[in-house]
């Protein structure tokens, strides 16, 4: 119940404030970023438990119906399977006929029989534009050892219409994963995500996963020895710190160690981080 009291400046209304008082309603893009961050954290903290096999997806090329925008598009693919999210490199100036030839190794959780594929146009000064998407059902014949090489239709409502956005060529194979098999770890980065009702908030101290077509970590049934990480030299650390003064020293060290001392790969990962900040 609301009440009114008098102060030196006049009457003041006192009552229960609505739950959305002084809160910013997140956009669809912000909600998508939040969902991606949650999915990545699920993968990092046990999302790959109970995996039963490994699916190899080769994203070969696409034939799109239209080039959106004034310049040639820079398309890339995003694949979501279970809690894991994978991305191909960007096909710069790929326009309507991008080629990736990117092999993505995915762990398949129990009960998962399909994955969601999206094609984005990478933008330099705005949010990436989603131009096509489709659900792909994992063929049953893969579990019997066959290899599937097919073109899949892309649907995009609101522009060209359903199943009119073009085709994408995927090559898929499947392999059973023995118990205790250890897959390569993903790159661990510090996330900055949109939180509902708060706005753009960096979350410190909680690692998430960035998958650029990389292999997620399979949780082994029996204890296994973690792979030896390459030492991070102070010279490389200082050089990268000079290149990325806005990033924390420990974050840079973590990226270098995750890339096993590969300086060029670490620079690419750090560039991706700065683009998202």
UniProtKB/Swiss-Prot annotation:
Tissue spec. comment: Ubiquitous.
Any GO BP annotation: autophagy
Positions of short motif AIM2: 151-154
Location(s) in or outside the cell: Cytoplasm
Span(s) of short sequence motif AIM1: 133-136
Domain of life assignment: Eukaryota
Gene3D superfamilies the UniProt entry points to: C2 domain (2.60.40.150), DNA helicase RuvA subunit, C-terminal domain (1.10.8.10)
Pfam families attached to this UniProt entry: C2, CUE
CDD domains referenced in this protein's UniProt entry, alphabetically: C2_Tollip (cd04016), CUE_TOLIP (cd14363)
Domain (CUE) ranges: 232-275
Residues annotated as domain C2: 35-152
Keywords: Autophagy, Cytoplasm, Immunity, Inflammatory response, Innate immunity, Repeat
Free-text function comment from the UniProt entry: Component of the signaling pathway of IL-1 and Toll-like receptors. Inhibits cell activation by microbial products. Connects the ubiquitin pathway to autophagy by functioning as a ubiquitin-ATG8 family adapter and thus mediating autophagic clearance of ubiquitin conjugates. The TOLLIP-dependent selective autophagy pathway plays an important role in clearance of cytotoxic polyQ proteins aggregates.
Subunit structure, as described in the record: Interacts with ATG8 family proteins (via AIM motifs), and ubiquitin (via CUE domain).
Protein name per UniProt: Toll-interacting protein A
Species annotation: Oncorhynchus mykiss
Name of the gene this protein is made from: tollipa
